[in-house]
A protein has these predicted regions:
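Short acidic-glycine-tyrosine-enriched beta hairpin
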Residues: 66-81
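Conserved short histidine dyad/triad with adjacent acidic residue
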Residues: 15, 30-46
């Protein structure tokens, strides 16, 4: 077993970052995104699947050119290679748990 406190994870940009390869060689990487309204990553893709669980707030996602709205309780499953971006909207922060099905974080910004 490997135990990690959120406060001990690096906070990069808008996310606490749990990179599996650096945390007991876990087979996944997990990011807790805290985005202010208007924030979010531009178009990018990963060579593995990603699952995003929205915990708080609202956002707008674009996946392969299609736009979707999401809010607390919604889940997005983004397949390997799909071009995607998202942005927090509304008056409150967007908080989501992003699970990358890889022990290493790999992202191609487009």
């Amino acid at each position: 077993m490997h135990y990690v406190r959120q406060e001990d994870l690096p906070f990069v940009g808008s996310s606490h970052e749990f990179v599996g390869a650096e945390q007991g060689d876990a087979g996944v990487s997990v990011f807790l995104f805290h985005g202010k309204p208007g924030s979010g990553p531009g178009p990018h893709r990963h060579p593995y699947d990603e699952i995003q669980f929205i915990r708080e707030g609202r956002g707008v996602w674009t996946v392969n050119g299609k736009t979707f709205e999401g809010s607390a309780g919604d889940i997005f499953v983004i397949k390997a290679g799909e071009i995607h971006s998202f942005k927090a909207v509304g008056d409150s922060p967007l908080v989501q748990l992003d699970i990358h099905l890889s022990p290493r974080f790999t992202q191609e910004n487009l």
